[in-house]
Amino acid sequence: MSVFDSKFNGIHVYSEIGELETVLVHEPGREIDYITPARLDELLFSAILESHDARKEHQSFVKIMKDRGINVVELTDLVAETYDLASKAAKEEFIETFLEETVPVLTEANKKAVRAFLLSKPTHEMVEFMMSGITKYELGVESENELIVDPMPNLYFTRDPFASVGNGVTIHFMRYIVRRRETLFARFVFRNHPKLVKTPWYYDPAMKMPIEGGDVFIYNNETLVVGVSERTDLDTITLLAKNIKANKEVEFKRIVAINVPKWTNLMHLDTWLTMLDKNKFLYSPIANDVFKFWDYDLVNGGAEPQPQLNGLPLDKLLASIINKEPVLIPIGGAGATEMEIARETNFDGTNYLAIKPGLVIGYDRNEKTNAALKAAGITVLPFHGNQLSLGMGNARCMSMPLSRKDVKW
């Protein structure tokens, strides 16, 4: 039985808010058990997660979506299914690419040992080890380091390695080395899974300019919005604009780049501003003095559209995209104190996942913001995420929509 239901016909995402049909997630595996105090900064975590609780929290998040009929695809299952369906040559390339990209770099002897170890496992277990890391005890080799292959503990943030853009994808070059290997799985499934192999790529990690999915938004079928952030550069967005412009089948007419604070704990646009309904947006007031906007004209901007500074304030900019007056909801609500705004911004208070217009999922810990959303007519489906939030992401970070219904604007 395929990970995809019978309704899935390939990538189709033309909004942030259309009814969610198919979504990619990853329940944290053994990889989070290998986070140690000495490596917190390197692995991009604020604290060590309690693994059992983190998994229970993630299961609660997934249950909310499954209970509403959403086809929830687990990354491990998708990669394993793709591997079983792939040609012998594709399987070999997948394993060899993994070995070449492994951190730390493998000696020839360890490369041989890891290859044999992986190929001795059933497919699903093999993929789990590729994601979680491999110790010297599991491999049966002598080493000063316990880990022969490092873990990928950020994999539960499926938003970032690639993004669904219309009927295509952007597969990313991640800013930090610890996350770059994550795109191996996206590259493999989009080259080899029968349901995904024909998907056009608008960005390839071989382009080696940083961009991550938490910065990529599809506001409607004409406009992309991309963050200029701690993880994504304006020059990368310029290259993306050129790539999209060059594809004659793409409908998008405009890209808007939004500058946000370059904070390591709030690293993407979706930790500062998100779209939750046809005209309702949630934002952090902390970013007010940093917001700056550039326009890319994909219709009249020539073969290589360049960023044009747009001097509009946030509300007028959003109005120019959605063609109506936006409702701007600040984190914590209109009466929130600076401390309340700072606390709820820190725990990704803007990072909700819309599963229908005005129906969103997010952490229960951001109580002030949840109340403000309710007052603005947004329905919040809350879940407990005190452990998951230590990885610095909320529901949007932990999901990559693969298909949404089109919105009737």
Curated annotation (Swiss-Prot):
Q: GO terms for biological process?
A: arginine catabolic process to ornithine; arginine deiminase pathway
Pfam entry (one): ADI
Pathway as given in its UniProt record: Amino-acid degradation; L-arginine degradation via ADI pathway; carbamoyl phosphate from L-arginine: step 1/2
InterPro entries reported for this sequence: Arg_deiminase (IPR003876)
CC annotations in GO: cytoplasm
Record's superkingdom? Bacteria
**According to the UniProt entry, what is the EC number of this protein?**
3.5.3.6
Catalytic reaction equation(s) = L-arginine + H2O = L-citrulline + NH4(+)
- Range of residues in the leader sequence: none
Enzyme class name: hydrolase
The positions flagged as active site in the entry are C397
Q: Which GO terms describe its molecular function?
A: arginine deiminase activity
What are the entry keywords?
Arginine metabolism, Cytoplasm, Hydrolase
Family label: Belongs to the arginine deiminase family.
What name has this protein been given in UniProt? Arginine deiminase
Task: Give the organism, scientific name.
Answer: Metamycoplasma hominis (Mycoplasma hominis)
